[in-house]
Amino acid sequence: MGICHGKPVEQQSKSLPVSGETNEAPTNSQPPAKSSGFPFYSPSPVPSLFKSSPSVSSSVSSTPLRIFKRPFPPPSPAKHIRAFLARRYGSVKPNEVSIPEGKECEIGLDKSFGFSKQFASHYEIDGEVGRGHFGYTCSAKGKKGSLKGQEVAVKVIPKSKMTTAIAIEDVSREVKMLRALTGHKNLVQFYDAFEDDENVYIVMELCKGGELLDKILQRGGKYSEDDAKKVMVQILSVVAYCHLQGVVHRDLKPENFLFSTKDETSPLKAIDFGLSDYVKPDERLNDIVGSAYYVAPEVLHRTYGTEADMWSIGVIAYILLCGSRPFWARTESGIFRAVLKAEPNFEEAPWPSLSPEAVDFVKRLLNKDYRKRLTAAQALCHPWLVGSHELKIPSDMIIYKLVKVYIMSTSLRKSALAALAKTLTVPQLAYLREQFTLLGPSKNGYISMQNYKTAILKSSTDAMKDSRVFDFVHMISCLQYKKLDFEEFCASALSVYQLEAMETWEQHARRAYELFEKDGNRPIMIEELASELGLGPSVPVHVVLQDWIRHSDGKLSFLGFVRLLHGVSSRTLQKA
């Protein structure tokens, strides 16, 4: 269901220039790479750019191996991923024996969705405009009602393809999400959903401007920085909106963004929520979905949240700016290993000629540690994009998560965070100022825990209710804590991990420690520090905490200060 808006049939042979690619054909001695046959790891998210097999004709340029920093040892993650996806969508049994379509796996499945069955009386189908693994998309015209005479897109999903309960649930959830989220200017407009005995029909806005992928190809494989900024702002805007509602897309790629019209100023529209899911701010997903070249490392590790979408946006940004993908290989196994282990190349052209801000933007999205990645709202405030848009920055759920942790922290850690917040620069404070303003501070400049709930209600949709974001926010609003001014809000909403990802982290940490020495540091016994950290009796505190305290005066050392900022857990300490 994830690619029913897939590339049109006539676009199969498209290719995109790739840095370092040659025209040398592979030798016949090379065996062809196996393809999984699943849309989530389709051989070609960007058709010929992302080749699935070296066994192609000599007329098609081959892709030489990129030189990685180190070899990748087995085992490969690909086999268990393919098996997992097969079980999810009913292609094979757990032992990978093929199941005939419509047989054992369909027994007892209820494929009735409760949608209207009057599709034929409302719309007349025209030609097919795209085809995916689980369905296809057609253009159609409204016969009556408010859409009479209007062209629309109809995503047709055959019920014969719904061979598992999970597949049926995915279709139901996609419709529910589109219905709840529709209205954002960069999200395809949803009109209605129908069904009959054979198919489900999802009626949406018809976008005639083509895929973002097509535009990349028309421009010779890449965008100028200014044009790339315009694309990124639109992608980040709709993704920030979805993430606030507790929706993670899970299949962001150039094919899933369409231009509304062929006009140069046409808005970009996000499509295909077939793989999307709800995610609560304090929960993680574990099912493996996505498209191989855009999948985040933590997805392969089966523990991820909205940060996985930000990785995919980083891959799109990389392609827009240089025309090459950051991670690639001839096989799926190689792609996964590259995503997990390899680093993107920022040394080859055109990267040295691009602005430092552009390079930093991409690097901060393609960080393998999801905790260090920018959120969509933060990315809109990045120096590379500031000044290129006038969007109102939306509320950011990471603020709510950080504030919750801050309130539950010890007084010692709060003092350390307060010192770190004082080292932030004016551009770094701009994002926090935006978030503070969205919370609606009083005339005296203070916010209470109730402000968090009130602010989120202003942006709520039915999707937010289904994702249980409300439950999380309500829990924060019920916490007993004093009102916060902007200075303490900065300390509470500061992500140490994200700051650590910056090149200026060392300066921030050293300067913060100097401030902490003056205002917050004090003599502390190891036992007291262990109690402050909530360490249990099983932790050998005199061993793991001895470097945290200076022997000269019994105060926190710089190492102890930095680790305290991170809120080191007892589990982390035991690994140290």
From Swiss-Prot:
Stretches with biased composition (Polar residues): 10-33
Binding site for Ca(2+) 1: 442, 444, 446
UniProt KW keywords: ATP-binding, Calcium, Kinase, Lipoprotein, Membrane, Metal-binding, Myristate, Nucleotide-binding, Phosphoprotein, Repeat, Serine/threonine-protein kinase, Stress response, Transferase
Residue ranges of domain Protein kinase in the record: 123-385
Active site (UniProt): 251
GO biological process: heat acclimation; protein autophosphorylation
Binding, Ca(2+) 3: 519, 521, 528
Domain EF-hand: 427-463, 464-499, 500-539, 542-571
Chain residue ranges for the region called Autoinhibitory domain: 390-420
EC id: 2.7.11.1
Reactions accelerated catalytically: L-seryl-[protein] + ATP = O-phospho-L-seryl-[protein] + ADP + H(+); L-threonyl-[protein] + ATP = O-phospho-L-threonyl-[protein] + ADP + H(+)
Main location: membrane
Keyword Transcription regulation tagged: no
A GO CC term attached to the entry: membrane
GO molecular function, one term: calcium/calmodulin-dependent protein kinase activity
Binding site for Ca(2+) 2: 483, 488
Subcellular location: Membrane
Traits of the deletion mutant: Impaired basal thermotolerance.
Modified residues (Phosphoserine): 291, 333, 557
Annotated region described as Disordered, given as residue ranges: 1-39
Family statement: Belongs to the protein kinase superfamily. Ser/Thr protein kinase family. CDPK subfamily.
Recorded domain comment: There are 3 contiguous domains conserved in the CDPK subfamily: a kinase domain, an autoinhibitory (junction) domain and a calmodulin-like domain. The autoinhibitory domain (390-420) inactivates kinase activity under calcium-free conditions.
Protein name as annotated: CDPK-related kinase 1
Source organism (scientific name): Arabidopsis thaliana (Mouse-ear cress)
Taxonomic lineage of the native organism: Eukaryota, Viridiplantae, Streptophyta, Embryophyta, Tracheophyta
